[in-house]
Amino acid sequence: MSTGSLPLGLPSRDSLDGLRNSVDLPLLAAAALLLGLGLIMVASASMDLGERYYGNTWHFFQRQVLFAAIGLALATVMWAIPLERWERAGPWLLILVMVLLIAVLLPGVGRTVNGATRWIPIGMFNLQVAEPVKLLVVMYLAGYIVRHYSALRLHLRGFVRPLVVLGFGTVLLLLQPDFGGAAIMLAIGMGMLFLAGAKLWQFAALGATIAVGMAFVAVAAPYRVARLTAFLDPWQDPFATGFQLTQSLIAIGSGGWFGTGLGNSVQKLFYLPEAHNDFLFAVFAEEFGFIGVLALIALFAVVVWRCVKIGLWAERAGHAFGSHLAFGVAIWLALQSALNLAVNMGLLPTKGMTLPFLSYGGSSLIVTLMAIGLVMRVYREAQIPAPRQSTPPRRKRGQA
């Protein structure tokens, strides 16, 4: 049957082929499911909170829908812009990173909440600078790796230069303080440099340096160590340092195999702080149970897997910059989602860290969707082989 004889409203084969060449359908489907699930869970976890503080049951849900719309619009923009423009803009992206991280610390510019200065007010919106910084760092490092590929693999200075940038950014994040954001940014950078071929002994030396620094902090400020290790036994002080974690564990344990059902969480009723934000996973586990948690993890796994696959396709097509972009986004989303789940389950210290796609918050949701749009652009360009390779193909470790 010819495409012209298709029933009205059905897409032609040519249009479907065009869609497959423009976007990665498995990634699109998984991201869309996570976004929809996030909107549902924000509504479920925040209804009572919105009614109490704003007189509007749907306050947080409505704002999250607005953030999602903005994020989807910006994701479309990221998808439409050729990667070559972002590659050329590398130095400007680095400047923007530093401007954001310094500006938020300036009196009268940054907004302080609960002792942390992490936000820049922009109208009705509060920009949490750590979120765009993650994406900008991925974009900058992808360009750096392409420009200095040989130096990164063969010379120490090629490894040290991006470390100086990451170190300076980490210090600025710690001054806010934002320990979670600093850890994520540093880990993204280390992961991208490792995949680019930096030598193992360099990472070993860096790890030893970090260990010495942590030991110094433990000796100089033991109270900080006590706060960080409170997660090891939250029941020792369940009404102070261990309160949030104990409530999270109660929520997760109450879910059982199949959960209490959507909207039936008890812990979200002002027992669990940040139930709609950093600890949304605990509410999800309570309402959907162990089976729901497995499904959620599977969706995140699909997103990360497709980002890695797209990175490999881009590498084979000779698009080195796009390849490192996709790998960087994969590292970022995998690490942040895993750390958020670990914090909710008491495997890591409690630190402010959102769950991508799900947690309430405009900065996180918008930037996450922009990152997906960027990876979709990598997929789109990977369909056409590059006229020349920007860098040699990655070699396996140990090869000359």
From Swiss-Prot:
One MF annotation (Gene Ontology) recorded for this entry: peptidoglycan glycosyltransferase activity
Q: EC number(s) in its UniProt entry?
A: 2.4.99.28
Q: Where does the protein end up? A: Cell inner membrane
In terms of InterPro entries, this protein maps to: Cell_cycle_FtsW-rel_CS, FtsW, FtsW/RodA
Cystine crosslinks: none
Catalytic reaction(s) noted = [GlcNAc-(1->4)-Mur2Ac(oyl-L-Ala-gamma-D-Glu-L-Lys-D-Ala-D-Ala)](n)-di-trans,octa-cis-undecaprenyl diphosphate + beta-D-GlcNAc-(1->4)-Mur2Ac(oyl-L-Ala-gamma-D-Glu-L-Lys-D-Ala-D-Ala)-di-trans,octa-cis-undecaprenyl diphosphate = [GlcNAc-(1->4)-Mur2Ac(oyl-L-Ala-gamma-D-Glu-L-Lys-D-Ala-D-Ala)](n+1)-di-trans,octa-cis-undecaprenyl diphosphate + di-trans,octa-cis-undecaprenyl diphosphate + H(+)
Pathway recorded for this protein: Cell wall biogenesis; peptidoglycan biosynthesis
Question: Which GO terms fall under biological process for this protein?
Answer: cell wall organization; FtsZ-dependent cytokinesis; peptidoglycan biosynthetic process; regulation of cell shape
UniProt keywords (A-Z) are: Cell cycle, Cell division, Cell inner membrane, Cell membrane, Cell shape, Cell wall biogenesis/degradation, Glycosyltransferase, Membrane, Peptidoglycan synthesis, Transferase, Transmembrane, Transmembrane helix
Q: How does it sit in the membrane?
A: Multi-pass membrane protein
Task: State which ranges are Periplasmic (membrane side).
Answer: 46-63, 110-118, 175-177, 221-278, 346-354
- Chief localization: membrane
Instruction: Return the similarity comment.
Output: Belongs to the SEDS family. FtsW subfamily.
Q: Function of this protein?
A: Peptidoglycan polymerase that is essential for cell division.
Q: What is this protein called?
A: Probable peptidoglycan glycosyltransferase FtsW
Which species expresses this protein natively? Thioalkalivibrio sp. (strain K90mix)
